[in-house]
């Protein structure tokens, strides 16, 4: 049918053409990978969500979690489609209830990430969503927080992986799915 053909054709969509490079942002020497063109194209955005969802067994995930802020844009529709609760990792001082925290280093600085102390239960199996893996610092801090709950990250999914920054090295023993890799 025509709908099946459209679905198959979209599966071969080159999503990298919807990523825009912004030189010297947020600081000089960094080339920022802007996902807003992908988000503003309904077909590209839907294809991104579908590729992530198609990579996971819903029965092996209890919670979809995400990292502030671009990860939220992906995780909300993924959690909805998987019929799983959504948990948010936020920058320090952004959550109103009692929190647990972990510090991390970025490609261009450092920071602290927090999560509500009741957001995850022991033995929860988590799918962690973000827009990008660079050095792995932010996602590594999320893994540290998940460990504090005695839960487990069953997978990490991102749109973009900057593999030349070796972020996977910090995220050992976790299955990582990235749609676009820059070497």
Model-derived features: where do they sit?
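Active-site-facing substrate-recognition patch
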Residues: 12-61, 111
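PRPP-dependent phosphoribosyltransferase catalytic core
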Residues: 17-18, 140-183
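Short glycine-rich phosphate-binding loop at a beta-alpha junction
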Residues: 61-68
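Short Gly/Thr/Asp-enriched flexible loops that form oxyanion-binding sites at enzyme active sites
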Residues: 73-82, 143
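Short, glycine/charge-rich flexible loops or terminal/linker lids adjacent to PRPP-binding catalytic cores
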Residues: 85-126
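Conserved G/P- and acidic residue-centered "switch" motifs that form tight phosphate/ATP-binding loops
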Residues: 131, 136
């Amino acid at each position: 049918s025509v709908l099946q053909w459209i679905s198959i054709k979209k599966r071969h969509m080159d999503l990298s053409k919807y990523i825009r490079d912004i030189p010297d942002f947020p600081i000089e020497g960094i080339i920022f990978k802007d996902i807003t063109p992908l988000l503003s194209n309904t077909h590209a955005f839907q294809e991104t969500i579908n590729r992530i969802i198609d990579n996971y067994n819903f029965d092996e995930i209890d919670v979809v979690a995400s990292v502030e802020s671009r990860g939220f844009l992906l995780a909300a529709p993924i959690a909805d489609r998987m019929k799983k609760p959504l948990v948010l990792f936020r920058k320090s001082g952004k959550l109103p209830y009692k929190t647990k925290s972990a510090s991390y280093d970025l490609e261009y600085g450092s920071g602290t990430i927090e999560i509500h102390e009741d957001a995850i239960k022991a033995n929860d199996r988590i799918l962690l969503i973000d827009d990008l893996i660079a050095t792995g610092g932010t996602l590594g801090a999320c893994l540290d927080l998940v460990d504090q709950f005695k839960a487990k990250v069953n997978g990490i999914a991102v749109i973009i992986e900057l593999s030349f920054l070796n972020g996977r090295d910090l995220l050992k023993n976790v299955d990582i799915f990235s749609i676009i890799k820059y070497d």
